């Protein structure tokens, strides 16, 4: 996320009560915000995965840029917080989905 860790941690705690992620990566961890890919690359290192074998799902153009720069396949989430005046289909993601269920057919 591009949110500061103190803020993002509270959001994760409040919204993901039944699922606890293994880790949370924020700009505090890398010193850089998306569209820089540093956070995504760190996530791959922490999870022992290859970016070229990974998907990055985003609801903002900077997410797609970061994912592509990191070497990942990208999925534009048209159902997320797409900024007013933008269209997810304009972000040039590898895939676009309109609901979380559609992601399961891609990964």
Where in the sequence are the language-model features?
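Asp-based, Mg2+/Mn2+-dependent phosphohydrolase catalytic module
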Residues: 5, 9-107
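Conserved phosphate-coupling serine/threonine residues in phosphotransfer and NTP-handling enzymes
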Residues: 1-3
């Amino acid at each position: 996320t591009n949110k500061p860790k103190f803020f993002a941690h509270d959001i994760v705690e409040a919204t993901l009560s039944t699922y606890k992620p293994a880790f949370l990566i924020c700009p505090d961890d890398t010193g850089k915000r998306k569209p820089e890919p540093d956070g995504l690359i760190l996530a791959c290192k922490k999870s022992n995965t290859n970016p070229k074998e990974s998907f990055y799902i985003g609801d903002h153009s900077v997410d797609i840029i970061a994912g592509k720069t990191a070497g990942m396949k990208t999925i534009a989430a048209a159902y997320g917080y797409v900024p007013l005046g933008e269209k997810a289909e304009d972000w040039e993601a590898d895939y676009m989905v309109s609901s979380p269920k559609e992601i399961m057919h891609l990964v």
